[in-house]
């Protein structure tokens, strides 16, 4: 995995931070998660880490960037995980998924978090979880004085809108975990399943 981590760092490709991925791996183990939908593959790092936990785990992951998709396909085959990981080339905005999943992991365009959450929540099994990464945006969400560009401000505002969406969501209860770039763990409340 060091090789993928170094490649991502050198090529400025966002992958989940080390303590975040370790938390995610432990969560998957503790909750006996077997079927995962990942929105945003990048180079396949998270999928490879999750699939490596157990040979019974099956992952469907979606990536819209062709170069990253091709690299993810290469990496998944390199680690002999192509039987466990199904990678789809396409935009998760337009991709229709029919499977049901124990875990939906959203790690894609931050401005689309609400859309992805709403679109894919019906692919969640009873008792399933939606985990969303990058809710701190490198500390900019908590400290707006650090925001330097209009683009950053737009992303920060969309993340704040998403956090408000989660906080006011009657269907899902959400817990925020300060690991990596901050993650949200959202579980459907009883009575909504």
What are these regions (language model features)?
Residues 1-103, 110-131, 135-193:
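A short alpha-helical cap/connector motif
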